[in-house]
Swiss-Prot record:
The keyword rRNA-binding does not apply. This is Peptidase T. InterPro entries: ArgE/DapE_CS, Bact_exopeptidase_dim_dom, Peptidase_M20, Peptidase_M20_dimer, Peptidase_M20B. Its EC number is 3.4.11.4. HAMAP family: Aminopeptidase_M20 (MF_00550). One of its GO terms (cellular component) is cytosol.
Amino acid sequence: MKKQIIERLTRYVKIDTQSNPDSKTTPSTNKQWDLLNLLEEELQSLGLKTDMDEHGYLFATLESNINYNVPTVGFLAHVDTSPDFNASHVNPQIIEAYNGQPIKLGESQRILDPDVFPELNKVVGHTLMVTDGTSLLGADDKAGVVEIMEGIKYLIDHPDIKHGTIRVGFTPDEEIGRGPHQFDVSRFNADFAYTMDGSQLGELQFESFNAAEVTVTCHGVNVHPGSAKNAMVNAISLGQQFNSLLPSHEVPERTEGYEGFYHLMNFTGNVEKATLQYIIRDHDKEQFELRKKRMMEIRDDINVHYNHFPIKVDVHDQYFNMAEKIEPLKHIIDIPKRVFEALDIVPNTEPIRGGTDGSQLSFMGLPTPNIFTGCGNFHGPFEYASIDVMEKAVHVVVGIAQEVANSHQSYK
């Protein structure tokens, strides 16, 4: 199976599917259609019924081969790649039996070094796919696409493996936070689903951040600096003051585990106007709300000293902790745990310090935990994929389908 995984992943990563946060269309880039159309053809060649809408949401159905009712399970992956780094002319390199030493990435002068990326020590002896140092790899999330495709093909090639109805979904624009925005849960028509969009072997994630984006706009008063005393209000200084009043230790670079943070993503402006772009993250809903409240309080504390109330704060909730929707449905986690155990994989249920499409889908009525793909260092030239772990992920897809069928009961 490793050969087929390498061939399929190579085929997919060479297609540039980078999304664009500045676009107003869905998909945000036309080039995502290139992979979506290919996947539709490949699914149809496997005998699956497909359905792709005008927004690039490709759904397919593998019909049940049993004569009793079990839940319909879905498997999801996104086709777009991150806008954070070059995604064109991807030239994947294969490292056989990785020896644990630094890997020179093509002619780029970049080195994939286990001293810098210690998770590489977990894949010694594996076959790896890496970049040539000039682009990201796109294993996030084309590895997930491969694992679903290979899992479906395996089930078709082994009709003795019993399974219920399986729904497949390949979606656009996850990397820019819009993956579920046009996702039609009723059209997908699954009882629950799994995103194949994790990283290290064993990841089984059903806790995510609560997330919001915050725009702080500071309005100044521009006066000639030679006569500015008691008249000028410098918007840049207001922005600096605002940021200084947030807890300095509650930032991404000083937090881990369940610790939340404020993250200043961008700060631009001049004397007349300055804009600060933040994201807020916290696993705890109460603390999440307190973080938003704290930013409003800082605004008020500064504005009280000025006649024109110079600071505005706009908050937009992005997604919420999917544990709220998944934990009451214990079987959705128990199923992959049993599959992991059968494959000698130790489950790692640590919370995601981020979000997946499943974070939003779970609140849209489709509970969707996240499962490992075997890849790491996403969104940059040091991205890699372990073909060995990807093979295990394929067997997880197969195992979940089999486990649902073998349970002989409906979890609806």
